[in-house]
Regions:
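An N-terminal hydrophobic leader/cap segment in hydrolases
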Residues: 71-125, 135-138
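Short beta-strand/loop motif that positions the catalytic acidic residue
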Residues: 406, 411-414, 418
């Protein structure tokens, strides 16, 4: 029962609108938060401390076992590659030498400036008190913005599970965020709660209350707060939205008739990259096939009630340190770095089968400087525990109607090699049960895997151009409809005869 998924009784987690909300002060752009240093009383409880310590140890062992299995699996997969000796194809647009001296840092601003852009750190507060990091892409060439097809129209982009806004800025000029900004759009990158070490109005990050959330909270609070923030900052009544995996799952849940369907009146376009609505065959494989048998009491004993397997973030930090020390031992450092980056890639990558076949090798280390981001144990239980998304196979009951008339125009971008989520069942569901959904575009790229819609070397040709083309056609059509309606209303005010054709 979803009502019993809450870790503690302070949140009902059965969202019926009766629980207390925190009201933001004055504006969504609140003062810069100060991370809480005060440890809550519960940490002074030895029983809680011991249980959490044991959970960290057990979950770390589980993670290392998964990584080892993943490395063995990948090593076997390398044998055919070595036999074929097939090199990475050269692309006419790629200037490899330009990026040789690039640093490996965890700074969105650094990667933006290296491509002729900048990024502003901004933040928003949700109604339940969480501070969210927002990144606004600044295009230094204002004339280019005016000339581009976007003409200053705002787009909000939201990341997937374990990821952050950094996923959309590490592919140089061909990053989704920078490419759209170069086309004239105002680009805002959202981040879910807990990403970039953001805090809460009342709860310390050490407190279990801080981590008592799942995707339903993201749909009720985080996404609406981000959408309203972008609308407020840009002055537009409606904005475009692009979400990858959990990012679009959050939007599908928010727009459903059980949550906040009125959010659809604020969106002019919804682009879903790897739509996470129907589960793929990978969810029936190890380790997800075992995780989905765990009930909540067992889950919290294994993984705790704070963030999910914190060792993942530690491994990311260690891999970074190996790239910044030991310069005299260059060859040893390079070998160790590759091994650690492989491990860092393998823990979420093997779990969700994020293969790197279509990526540029030089980009992989910086891609994973921003991955993984902290995720609550309760959020992972929603995805992979007992009676979870993995068990059900879909976000909602497939034979029901999910969306009301406010649902925004939708474009779907799937991957032919994506085994984590499936796009075609969603298309069939929309055609059978969703008369209120206007499906603008369905594109399933045969070679694409789960993250290739923005990380693949050819993502611009596979996906980005299609997004802009679809949005432009839809926007022009809406503008023409508004013009016709406006002319009809103006004519009817002063004439009794019909509007001439």
């Amino acid at each position: 029962d979803a009502r019993n998924m809450s870790m503690y009784t302070h949140v009902d987690n059965h969202f019926d609108g009766t629980h207390d909300l925190l009201t933001p002060e004055n504006t969504t752009l609140v003062q810069r938060h100060i991370p809480g240093n005060e440890r809550p009383d519960i940490l002074r409880n030895p029983r809680f401390w011991i249980s959490q310590t044991l959970a960290v140890i057990v979950s770390s062992v589980i993670l290392l076992a998964v990584v080892c299995v993943g490395l063995m699996h990948r090593s076997l997969g390398l044998i055919p590659r070595l036999i074929r000796l097939k090199g990475t194809p050269l692309r006419s647009w790629d200037c490899h030498g330009r990026w040789k001296g690039e640093k490996l840092v965890k700074s969105p601003q650094y990667y933006a400036r290296s491509c002729g852009f900048d990024i502003a750190d901004e933040q928003v507060e949700t109604k339940d008190g969480y501070y969210l990091r927002m990144h606004r892409v600044i295009c230094n060439d204002t004339e280019q913005m005016r000339r581009g097809p976007g003409k200053g129209y705002p787009i909000l982009i939201l990341h997937g599970l374990f990821q952050s806004s950094g996923s959309f800025i590490t592919s140089e000029e061909r990053s989704l965020a920078f490419w759209l900004a170069a086309q004239g759009y105002q680009v805002y990158l959202g981040n879910n709660r807990a990403a970039y070490d953001m805090g809460h109005r009342r709860f310390s990050r050490y407190a279990p209350e801080f981590w008592d959330y799942n995707i339903r909270d993201l749909a009720l609070y985080d996404l609406p707060a981000m959408v309203d923030y972008v609308r407020q900052r840009t002055g537009y009544e409606k904005i475009a939205f692009i979400g990858h995996s959990q990012g679009n799952a959050t939007a599908f849940i928010a727009l459903s008739r059980w949550f906040v369907p009125e959010l659809g009146t604020k969106l002019s376009y919804f682009g879903a990259l790897a739509p996470a609505v129907f589960a793929g065959p990978l969810t029936k494989c190890f380790p997800l096939s075992y995780m989905c048998k765990l009930d909540w009491p067992t889950w919290r004993r294994l993984f705790g009630v704070l963030d999910f397997i914190p060792l993942m973030k530690c491994m990311s930090w260690v891999s970074f340190q190996f790239r910044t020390i030991g310069r005299p031992l260059r060859h040893t450092r390079r070998l160790a770095t590759r091994c650690l980056v492989r491990k860092d890639v393998s823990n979420p990558a093997y779990l969700f089968e994020w293969n790197d076949t279509n990526w540029l090798s030089r980009r992989k280390p910086k891609m994973f400087r921003f991955t993984p981001q902290p995720v609550s144990s309760a959020a992972m239980f929603w995805w992979g525990g007992k009676d979870s998304f993995v068990t059900r196979g879909s976000l909602f009951e497939p034979d029901q109607q999910w969306f009301e008339e406010h649902f925004p125009p939708l474009a779907l971008y799937g991957g032919g090699r994506d085994r984590l989520v499936l796009t075609q069942p969603l298309v069939e569901h929309i055609r059978k049960h969703e008369p209120n959904v206007r499906l603008l575009r369905v594109k399933i790229q045969p070679e694409a895997e789960h993250c290739d819609h923005y990380w693949a070397a050819d993502a611009v040709e596979w996906c980005f151009m299609d997004i802009v083309g679809t949005w432009t056609i839809n926007h022009q059509m809406i503008s023409k409809i508004h013009d016709v309606i406006g002319k009809t209303l103006s004519w009817s005010l002063y004439n009794d005869s019909p509007l001439p054709s």
